Every structure is written in structure tokens, then in C-alpha cells.
Amino acid sequence: CLKDLPQGTRVGTASLRRKAILLNKRPDLDVDIIRGNVQTRLGKLAAGEFDATFLALAGLDRLGQRDVATEILSPEDFLPACAQGAVGITCRADDERTLAFLSALDDAPTRQTVMCERAMLDALDGSCQTPIAGLAEIYGDQMRLRGLIARLDGSEVLHTDVTGAIADAET
């Protein structure tokens, strides 16, 4: 378990967001960025380059390797990246046939939550180099947005938790 890792444990993650959150929760750990696909990162773990690593459960599931996970972290403890797990499809604006086909694939609640999370990301001028997390969820006619922005070293993490009308979710 994360809480039981000894001081100085070398932890690898591919995410600046996860690194900042982890350092904020456990500044006694040695957290570093690890590059490569899931197999490469597992190889680095097996080779002793790291004592532990963070991996997306979806990636482990795709590879049939869920069994290597020793702990599944909750979004309450580690908020995901904005729009993480959502798939977006684009096409030419004047291609009415394709637009009609794609409209059947649109999931309005997912689109609404993604747009809310991305609005927060835009308001914070976020990029892949900024430790920002966001998770929007719909409850009836309301949307709740939990978010955070952190210093890269984890020394400071600012949280927000707001609820409002879905119609206002992008403002």
C-alpha cells in the first residue's frame, strides 16, 4: 500500500500530476518520471530501477495484467487528468453525412463533463507540463467539479470543489 512504503522508496510515474500529488502526500518518497509504454515501465520496475510505479488500470486491463496492481487508488485521493478516459472524435464541419453518423455516438453527459473539466484547464492556462487534475460529475441537473493545481515539487496543492447548474458548467 502507498501509505506503507518506506521512506526513500523510489517511485516512478509518467505523470507530472501524479508526481506532484504523491510528493504532497508523501514528501519522504523519491518520485521520478518514468518514460515508456506499460511494458517498458514494468520492465524498469522488474530491473530494480524503481521500487514502485503508478500505472493506469485501463492499460493493465488492456494487456491482461491487472494482477500486477497491488493497490487501486481512488479519485478522492488522486484526481485524474482533465478529460482522462474520454474519447473525442472530430470531422470536417461541412461533412453533414459524417456529422449525422457521429451524432449517434455522442454521449451528452460525457461531453458536458469533459467540457467542464477542459474549461477549468483553460482557465488555469494548463498544459501537459502543469500538474492539474479535474473530475466533473453530473447529479441530476447539477454538475460537481473537483479540481486541483499543484506545484511541480508537490509543496503546494490547491483544491476546488464546486457545484452548479449544468448549463453554467463551461463558465
Can you say where each PLM-predicted feature lies in the sequence?
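A conserved helix-loop-strand patch within extracytoplasmic ligand-binding domains
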Residues: 1-29
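Small-molecule-sensing regulatory modules
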Residues: 24-171
